[in-house]
């Protein structure tokens, strides 16, 4: 990876329509150079014998089997509701109708 310099940061800032002072350009160039070096060192550490992974640990399904148990009918569910309309719970509106 090529080193990031002040001119690169200025070019990127222009592309992103971000105004940066000379001090900000210098500081950002230094910070980005550190990041690039960090990525470079990680790239070197992972050799061809290390398989690419998206997770550091294997993923397994930890969900239980979906077993249908005792369920209430719609009427039973709505029996304790303070208000219902056409077989559904009726609740106060919280959003405008705009």
UniProtKB/Swiss-Prot annotation:
Keyword rRNA-binding: no
Leading EC class: ligase
NCBIfam families in the cross-refs: gatC
Xref: Pfam families: GatC
UniProt EC number: 6.3.5.-
Keyword vocabulary terms for this entry: ATP-binding, Ligase, Nucleotide-binding, Protein biosynthesis
Catalytic activity: L-glutamyl-tRNA(Gln) + L-glutamine + ATP + H2O = L-glutaminyl-tRNA(Gln) + L-glutamate + ADP + phosphate + H(+); L-aspartyl-tRNA(Asn) + L-glutamine + ATP + H2O = L-asparaginyl-tRNA(Asn) + L-glutamate + ADP + phosphate + 2 H(+)
Protein family (similarity comment): Belongs to the GatC family.
InterPro entries hit by this protein: Asp/Glu-ADT_sf_sub_c, GatC
Gene that encodes the chain: gatC
Complexes and interactors: Heterotrimer of A, B and C subunits.
Source species, domain of life: Bacteria
Job description of the protein: Allows the formation of correctly charged Asn-tRNA(Asn) or Gln-tRNA(Gln) through the transamidation of misacylated Asp-tRNA(Asn) or Glu-tRNA(Gln) in organisms which lack either or both of asparaginyl-tRNA or glutaminyl-tRNA synthetases. The reaction takes place in the presence of glutamine and ATP through an activated phospho-Asp-tRNA(Asn) or phospho-Glu-tRNA(Gln).
A biological-process GO annotation: regulation of translational fidelity
GO-annotated molecular function: asparaginyl-tRNA synthase (glutamine-hydrolyzing) activity; ATP binding; glutaminyl-tRNA synthase (glutamine-hydrolyzing) activity
Name of the protein described by the UniProt record: Aspartyl/glutamyl-tRNA(Asn/Gln) amidotransferase subunit C
Organism: Arthrobacter sp. (strain FB24)
């Amino acid at each position: 990876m090529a080193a990031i310099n002040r001119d690169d940061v200025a070019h990127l800032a222009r592309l992103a329509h971000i105004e940066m002072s000379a001090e900000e350009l210098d500081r950002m160039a230094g910070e980005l150079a550190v990041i690039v070096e960090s990525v470079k060192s990680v790239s070197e550490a992972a050799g061809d014998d290390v398989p690419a992974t998206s997770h550091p640990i294997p993923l397994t399904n930890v969900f239980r089997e979906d077993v249908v148990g005792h369920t209430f009918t719609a009427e039973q569910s709505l029996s304790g509701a303070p208000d219902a309309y056409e077989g559904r719970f009726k609740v106060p509106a919280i959003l405008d109708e705009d």
